[in-house]
Amino acid sequence: MEKINYEEVGLKVGLEIHRQLDTKKLFSPVPSKLSDDVDFTFKRRLRPTMSELGEIDPAALEEFKKGRTYIYEANNELGDLVYMDEEPPRGPDEEALEVALQIAYLLNAKPVDEVYYMRKIVIDGSNVSGFQRTAIIATDGKVETPWGTVGIPTICLEEDAARIIETRDREVIYRIDRLGIPLVEISTTPDIHHPEQAKVVAKFIGDALRATRKVKRGLGTIRQDLNVSIKGGARIEIKGVQELDMIPVIIEREVQRQLNLLKIRDELRKRGVTPEDIKEEFYDVTDIFKDTKSKIIARILKKGGKVLAIKLPKFKGLIGMEIQPGRRLGTEFADRAKKYVPGIFHSDELPNYGITQEEVEKVRKLLELEEEDAFVLVAAQEEIAKKALKEVIIRAREAIIGVPEETRRALPDGNTQYMRPLPGKARMYPETDIPPIRITEEMKRRIKENLPELPQAKVEKYVKEFGIDKSMAQTIVDDERDELFEELIEMGVKPSLAASILAVVLKGLRKEVPIENITEEHIKGAFRLYLEGKIAKEAFEEIFKELAQHPEKTAEEVAQEKGLTLLSEEEVRKIVDEVVNQYIDVIKEKGMGAMGLIMGRVMTKVRGKADGKLVSQIVKEKIREISG
């Protein structure tokens, strides 16, 4: 696709970043950790209620229509009555509130005078109570970027949802260990006008969160959502963007999708089709496929299913049009139908999947299609097939109007997939169990006086004060090893060596061993051995490899087991003598030109057990002695 002029297409992007806080649960003194232990389960059915506006949210209504029962797994340690919705909430947790206020100040926001909790209706089963508690903590923050200022209108403190374990036909199993973990939600204004600008803003916010040292790390602890729109398109909410580097890719692909949907709309209008032309009429074409070679259809017919069809006037050639790499308008139709059937067939992709040209022609004839018309088939039990085709009809009508507002899921390749309609504003009503929380001037002053340093400022300080490479400083800060780095320097380790081990050696081991098993005490233990002259710096890598595999060991135990404790000078001289005697003729011929060869041979014998400088000094002495 040709390069997109984002200013011309009127790109607007807003970010929503959710990050778990590393404190107790928000409304109960239960530890905020995950567990695979299950001691008991309980069931719930959830129903939508009206908001304070007297309206029912469309996304909540769609979930209710699925008619699901929710089963919750819990254990005796984490299965608190608050989060089973059996007793009123306590709190909120003071530490979580203070961390949220720290984040607010780091993002140049103004804390509110009083915190009022609201209930946000959520009935997909992820909240036992059928709602999520959320409150605005601060407003009017901002992030400066090379493209301009991006506002942060709200910073909220809310509860995380239960985690999904299994989805069955009419049942969903959740585990409530994650339910109630404090979650800070940071929303920006839609003042982001370039994909790379979105990445810059997300990184700055991420840096501010990490600076507090009170946010959780690891898979599932951070969720980034995007709101993307273009001129003539629609606001699309994209959920679950995990990686920072994928943000520009996802935005670019969403712009591409909307531009192509607008092209399809324009072509449909040019062909003179209106939403009213797409009738909710289902044609039973089962007889055409009674002897079909299509395994999918044959299997369904054998179970008593049917093949139903709808006609889509003037859609020929457009259902198969690519709107994102590897995704077509037909994919959008299929995504909508997926709540009822695994997939659909459309005329732009047929003959295929065992469906023959002859069968296609028979369907076209039965539906009395004209040259520009298309059709969609669904094979399933009759009522299910009708429900699936109704979803396709809705999406086809939307295609004539343009881009529908939706909540979509980010896919690993940067594309997106339909999840549900965009939630309305009819989701909130006041939380009557939690009184307002006053943010006192004393609390504000105390938090402002103890704000942590932002990561970028720390990187610049390390480069200036310790003279280390900027990329090393960035790695140390990004890996949250900055406090450890400063402790090592206080222990007497040279900054250059500490930086090299933390940013190069440890980083290099990531693909080989689980370095997350290496604790700060392991690292400090290895450096103590080095400072005491017991190991060479070449031994760090071997020690860390072993500690990653066996974290129950100490650095000293590994050094002894692996024979990595330093050789005495006398032992080194003995090894050098052995190698020199082996290559004496080469030394006589080349003199100092044999230095590289001899050093290499000696180091293979003593690596990790002798200081490189000492080895070099002894080898030079020996070569000079022989070559005169």
UniProtKB/Swiss-Prot annotation:
Domain of life: Archaea
GO molecular function terms noted in the UniProt entry: aminoacyl-tRNA ligase activity; ATP binding; glutaminyl-tRNA synthase (glutamine-hydrolyzing) activity
Record's catalysed reaction(s): L-glutamyl-tRNA(Gln) + L-glutamine + ATP + H2O = L-glutaminyl-tRNA(Gln) + L-glutamate + ADP + phosphate + H(+)
GO aspect biological process, one term: glutaminyl-tRNAGln biosynthesis via transamidation
Name this protein carries in UniProt: Glutamyl-tRNA(Gln) amidotransferase subunit E
Subunit structure of this chain's protein: Heterodimer of GatD and GatE.
Keywords assigned by UniProt, alphabetized: ATP-binding, Ligase, Nucleotide-binding, Protein biosynthesis
Entry keyword Protein biosynthesis: yes
Leading EC class: ligase
Annotated PROSITE patterns: GATB
Function comment: Allows the formation of correctly charged Gln-tRNA(Gln) through the transamidation of misacylated Glu-tRNA(Gln) in organisms which lack glutaminyl-tRNA synthetase. The reaction takes place in the presence of glutamine and ATP through an activated gamma-phospho-Glu-tRNA(Gln). The GatDE system is specific for glutamate and does not act on aspartate.
Signal sequence segment: none
Pfam families, sorted: GAD, GatB_N, GatB_Yqey
Record-listed E.C. numbers: 6.3.5.-
Family membership noted in the UniProt record: Belongs to the GatB/GatE family. GatE subfamily.
Name of the coding gene: gatE
UniProt-listed HAMAP family: GatE (MF_00588)
GO CC term, one of those recorded: cytoplasm
